[in-house]
A protein has these predicted regions:
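Transmembrane signal-anchor hairpin modules in multi-pass inner-membrane enzymes, especially those
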Residues: 1-80, 178-181, 230-240, 403-445
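Membrane-interface segments at transmembrane-helix junctions in multi-pass inner-membrane proteins
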Residues: 134-180, 205-206, 331-335
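Hydrophobic alpha-helical segments of polytopic membrane proteins
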Residues: 70-81, 177-268, 356-357
């Protein structure tokens, strides 16, 4: 018995075992979550069994390996308690599962989570794309009233055209975040081409815009990086670095308020939607009637504290249009109406904490802004098959914005003649290794 206790203690003290447990549950759940967005046949019973298995594995990881401070423990307990009340009040299990996935990612490398997410999405979506073109699974084609006669919107193996486009957007977003330092001009041109193809074949306007903005944001960031590295003369570097830090702060603030901003805009546009208002009606038509449907939801169901059961029937899985179609696409209004104002507040606070925790990671801030824009119209904010950014709350996510030797902190140093120069920390240490502690001091944080 003592031997088993020692083995157990030894096993639970190894953090790698906890990481392995997380990825076991993560992969099982993600596989079936992504599969459900495709036209591949899948069994509901098998999905439920895998769901239960992944919940057990992730809960085991939390109980055996995770250690919290008192404040974080209270916060985590509050998140679980709120999601459990939402489950009882509305009957929806997904908020509880979302919280479980986030909490179980504690101390797991964020980069590794994104890599596995990206690999699984590329593999499954790639197979679905090829299978749909070969006729193995159905390639759903829809005729849109906005398109010319004879023009079709294709789903390429997904349950709907916008789902395919959303997968492409989130895969590109993840890949750009992971491999930001390897991006070149042809990647940005390729992103614009993909944006055009998504518009032409899927007519997914939101994801077309988001993919284009993705290339634009990262290209601009790349230019700023290149500019800051181009010269190391003090009179130029100092000014450029200050400008770079100013933009960095702007991204940080915008990311922090982006979800509150876009959520508020969508709520009031929906609340005050009237057909007679030409401006709002134009917006409604541009986003295919989403304001009208959201207003119906607000007036019919209202906003509750802990959520309510709201039947929704959307497009997808078939080319037949349901007669009782009703679906709220905006993530903000979807969460607010279905899961309640308290859980909606928790989601907003979580992303605010992610922004604060990773405020040195400008690329993550840009990614969250793009996510906030996308979720204004799409409902994928809490959908793990699409959005992987929420894991940054508890996962190990250090700043990836700057590589070695490209820090924004400047140092001033004096040589033997009394002249001073400004340079990056690494450059100063390499130039004056014997005097770096004595003669170097930071002049710009």
């Amino acid at each position: 018995m003592d031997f088993l206790i020692k083995k157990y203690n030894s096993w639970t003290k190894n953090p790698q075992n906890g990481e392995n447990l997380f990825f076991a549950g993560f992969i099982i759940y993600m596989f079936w979550s992504i599969m459900r967005t495709t036209m591949f046949p899948h069994s509901g019973m098998v999905f439920n069994m895998c769901l239960v298995l992944s919940v057990v594995i992730l809960a085991t990881k939390i109980f055996l390996f995770d250690v919290y401070t008192f404040k974080i423990f209270i916060a985590v307990a509050g998140m679980f308690a709120c999601s459990a009340i939402v489950l009882v009040s509305s009957g929806y299990f997904w908020p509880f599962l979302w919280v479980l996935m986030l909490v179980s990612a504690k101390d797991v490398p964020f980069r590794k989570i994104l890599q596995i997410y990206l690999l699984m999405n590329i593999s499954i979506m790639g197979l679905a794309f090829i299978a749909s073109l070969l006729g193995v699974i159905e390639n759903l084609a829809y005729i849109s009233a906005d398109l010319d006669k004879g023009m079709y919107r294709y789903s390429f193996g997904c349950v709907y055209t916008t789902d395919f486009a959303a997968h492409i957007f989130f895969m590109l977003l993840t890949a750009f975040y992971l491999y930001q330092e390897k991006l070149r001009w042809y990647h940005y041109i390729g992103t614009c081409v993909i944006s055009g193809l998504i518009y032409y074949f899927c007519y997914a306007k939101l994801d077309t815009i988001c993919i284009f903005l993705l290339g634009l944001f990262f290209a601009g960031y790349h230019v700023l990086q290149w500019q800051s590295k181009r010269e190391k003369q003090v009179l130029f570097v100092f000014k450029r670095t200050r400008a770079h830090i100013r933009w960095k702060k702007i991204w940080n603030v915008f990311a922090l308020v982006s979800m509150v901003l876009f959520g508020t805009v969508m709520y009031f546009l929906s609340l005050y939607y009237e057909e007679d208002n030409e401006f709002i009606e134009t917006i409604n038509e541009t986003i295919t009637g989403r304001l009208d449907l959201a207003k119906i939801g607000i007036e019919k169901y209202g906003i509750t504290l802990f959520g309510q059961n709201i039947p929704m029937v959307g497009m997808g899985g078939s080319t037949k249009s349901p007669k009782d179609y009703f679906f709220i696409d905006s993530s903000y209004l979807f969460i607010l109406l279905r899961y309640g104002i308290l859980f909606f507040g928790i989601v907003i606070v979580i992303y605010g904490l992610i922004c604060y925790k990773n405020r040195g990671d400008t690329v993550l801030m840009m990614s969250i802004i793009l996510l906030a824009i996308s979720c204004s119209i799409d409902h994928h904010l809490l959908d793990e098959a699409y959005n992987p950014l929420s894991y940054a709350l508890f996962a190990k996510a250090g700043s990836m914005a700057w590589g070695r030797g490209t820090e924004l902190k400047l140092y001033q140093m004096w040589d033997d003649s009394g002249r001073w120069q400004a340079c990056g920390k690494e450059d100063c240490q390499q130039s004056w290794p014997a005097r770096r502690h004595k003669n170097a001091r930071g002049i710009l944080e």
